[in-house]
Amino acid sequence: MERKNWFNKEIEEIEKELKTHRENGLTQEQVKQIREQKGYNELQAGKKKSLFQRFLDQFKDFSIIILIIAAVVSGVVGVQQGNGITDTIIILIVVLVNAIIGVAQESKAEKSLEALQKLSDHASKVIRDGNMQVVPAKELVPGDLVVLDTGDYIPADLRIVEEVNLKSQESSLTGESVPVEKTSEIIEETEIGIGDRKNMLFSSSLVTYGRGKGIVVETGMTTEVGKIAGMINSTEKQETPLQQKLNKLGKTLGIAALIICVVIFVVGLIQGKEPIQMFMTAVSLAVAAIPEGLAAVSTIVLAIGVQKMVKKNAIVKRLPAVETLGSSTVICSDKTGTLTQNKMTVEKVFWNDAIRDLSNIQEDEIDKELKKLVYANMLCNDTKISQDGTLTGDPTETALVDMAFNLNFDPSIYDRTPRVQEIPFDSDRKLMTTVNEMNGKYVVFTKGGIDELLKRCSAYEINNEVHQNINEHVNQIREKNEEMAKDALRVLGCAYKEIDHIPSKEEMKQIENDLIFIGMVGMIDPPREEAKVAVEKCKTAGIKVVMITGDHKITATAIAKKLGILENDDEAITGAELEKMTDEELAQNVRKYSVYARVSPEHKVRIVNAWQKNGEVVAMTGDGVNDSPALKKADIGCAMGIVGTDVAKEAADVILTDDNFATVVSAVEEGRRIYDNILKVIQFLLSSNVGEIIVLFFATLLTPLFSKWFGITDINSLEILLPIHILWINLVTDSLPALSLAFDPANSDIMERKPVKPGKGVFTKGMTWRVIYQGIMIGGLTLAAFMIGLGTTKIPINGLTLDQSKIEVGQTMAFVTLALSELTHVFNVRNNKKSIFKTGIFNNMKLIGAVVISALLVFVILWIPGLREIFSIPVLPTENIVELVCLVLAPIVIVEIFKLFKINGGEE
């Protein structure tokens, strides 16, 4: 699409190109013809997934597919053998519950475009055929002449043809918090950012001051906001690091399960076992190899994290986003309102030839000159003060009134000094003047830009003395002005003079002459104190903080230095400089820069993409329409809840309800805690499952030996664990403790370690070692329990005869030991370095409760006769209780020894 620089064209040229007129607009016939060509002034929505499609997405995980296959096969075999489909139903219920939770917790249908369309639902005043009329904004076409007043939404991209003191709020597009002064003059430069196109008005912005007319030059998807809509549509969400790791884990487990099943099936056939029996054993192994509860538990752990994050002022829309925050290696943050207070504040005051910090001025230091300076800023000011003290008006002007209140000036000054005349601010003069009645006299107060103000001053008041020749002081005043400007302060000067009567309109034209200069104030949108602490916390945690703003470079670098984001000026770059780089060059150099100023929405997306190309997990904060594509492109998008636009909120994964950068860092910390806890869940479930696999594997491979030792003639009769035992332990007994690990508190050093590398899988060396040796431990204890239940601990055994009752006692001992030893083992996984006696057993009471309930569920099977029959479990002999207790507590003793000798794998 050809890019047209409307700001770079004369009005006459635009009239000719669009066949319109700056006074009469288009004709109705022209409007009809143009609409047929260009369509309506509205935004196009992107494709959305249906509820059914999102439901089906939940079944793409490889381990879930294996479970479904196992469930179907188990059901077919169960029906053929007359055993029913209990196992199938249990597996399918778990899979279904996981899918429902996933869909319920995902964000609702993407509404970014719907929110954008709401911006164009307003009515607009337009001149057609020379007559003013009101039409829906969507009916505007290029060439229409739009009339705008204070408070009007701008319905399309307009080239200004007429303006009177016109200002517009473009922060949602540019990120700049201060309203932009507009002009109708041509701009000679050809390559400038949106924020510098002073003769243009942009769709979705707001007229905050003055009035004007503009010719519609772009509508719908060709407006600046439309281009953003197009970027939102074309931006696809990537899988989160956790999703990638769990998918990889699922595939690994699925392949491992298939290999084990094939090996067991073939070995069993070689041994002469029944094919159907071996098929069911293989299915049992598949069920044992894949932790059925992992997907559901991981989902619920994330959901619990979502609830905890709400209390920390972060609303999570997309469930996996919780963990992604914890994996973040780069945070790209908007400046205004996130890193700063989004409130212009006077920081420095210049009077009596000295610059002072406002916060250090004591009440007894307020002399005659400072009073005049403050009065000038209060009275030459259009800020409105409500009964409850709320200030409304231009941010610059409210900052000046706020300064007066901070110095304890009495608001009654407004009643005692009524305004009798004024000259409003305009962009040509860069000044505002009022005439106020004060103590029976009339005082002229003027404030504005230093250069323009000094031209109109003839004297300078210092230390209660008026120096009639200001030229002697001009250089020093300018130096002080530059000193404040270098700190990125917006500087306004003030002057006054006394007159003896209310000036007429003619006299007002010359009133801004022979003024007495009294001082200057410097203001800025200051950084949040908590943001500085948060940035330092990020550095310690190995997270790079990058400022991306539509504001000017000098302001951005000053704020970034105060926050500790930037050390040297060469770490800052502008959008114009960025525009000259290719994507490859940006990706190569992106680590050099910490501040990006005067950037466009396209630039923000490119910056995020450059970091992602470097293998980083990027979190992005923003509040405006201009931030939306980058919010969606980032691995995790965080929108502001207070000042954020609907568009930004819909494009984001997380909404910060307090608009605070510190909340992002708190959310990162919470994300790390959740990620740690999910790893604990994985370690717990996998080590338990490895134990189950070992038991089944050994039972199959060693059946001939057992048969020889025990004199069993039926090779199919010896099973240590039944499929229903495995299902009960995996789905019921283990799930509650695994779920309760979600409530484990964060380790004290959680924000002192580097982020987990994005490409790093779950199976690190340490994790693999722990899963294997702890699985062997649980499997070995279960086999030992089986032997004890048989009535012997000696191998080999000669001359021992076994009947079915002894086998059932052995199975019961194995089942109870496996279930309860896994419950004690859950305490081992809470910290892989520190002893459980140092980390504390009772600092997660939900885990204690879950272990107690799960243990009771095991005993319920032992105690209730009907359930004993279903599970083929006899009453447990009392003589085995002591051995059982020792076996159940053994995991804690063994792992504590491994931790003591530092062979447990440690944290990674």
Spans of features found by a protein language model:
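Conserved cytosolic headpiece of P-type ATPases
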Residues: 1-755, 760-763, 776, 815, ...
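Membrane-water interface at loop-to-transmembrane-helix junctions
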Residues: 759-776, 804-813
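A C-terminal functional module that forms or caps the active site or interfaces directly
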Residues: 829
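Generic alpha-helical transmembrane segments
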Residues: 733, 811-826
